[in-house]
Amino acid sequence: NLNEKRNQLIQFIWKTNTIPKQLPNLIDTNISDERFSNFSNLKQIDRLTIEMEHGLSSIVYVFSPENHNGNVILYHQGHSGGFINGKSTIQKFLDNGFTVAAFSMPLIGLNNQPIIELENIGEVKFFKHNQFVYLESENFSSMSYFFTPLSITLNYLSTNSSFENFHMVGISGGGWATTVYPSLDTRITK
């Protein structure tokens, strides 16, 4: 049963029966980022800050086009760097009227690399995904770091009634997130 599998996966990732329902911790609207100043059909960039367990945070940029088609693309970059590496892809989506929410993998790009106090070890700076194993417990799965920013960003974007459909694409590790996340959240249609 598909719903049963979805519920099991949600329970495994978040240790609850539902995906996160909250909104971003911080929303900065109409920011300036020189790296994207040459974009065409760009109305504004909003920066979402999503704070998670153990002090990890995720920074998401929402690129809004001047002329939009009512659809949103969640674009997830992979392990090679932040979503700046997908600049040409983001521009292509903007050219076609999509609002683009751009994500980087945890600990990469604009996302932080916190120092976390580990029992019996001490303070450790987290900068690689394989360190997440030290955070696993019966009450916490580090898998949530990969999917919580997607859920919270969708919660925020869903408050805008002008969006008709949510789509998702990704590269490398972002492609993996793109394969898994739509099975958890039926708001993603393609």
What is the predicted function of each stretch?
Residues N1-L23:
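N-terminal pre-domain segments of enzymes
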Residues E4, Q8, S88, Y145, ...:
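Extracytoplasmic/secreted proteins, especially bacterial periplasmic and envelope-associated proteins
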Residues Q8, F12, T16, K92, ...:
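Structured segments of extracytoplasmic/periplasmic soluble domains
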Residues K21-N67:
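N-terminal cap/lid segment of alpha/beta-hydrolase-fold proteins
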Residues I45, L56-I59, F83-T89, G175-W176:
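Short alpha-helical segments and helix-capping/turn motifs at coil-helix boundaries
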Residues F63, N71-G78:
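The conserved beta1-alpha1 loop
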Residues H76-T148:
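Cap/lid segment of the alpha/beta-hydrolase catalytic domain
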Residues S151-K190:
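Primarily recognizes the serine-hydrolase "nucleophile elbow" in alpha/beta-hydrolase
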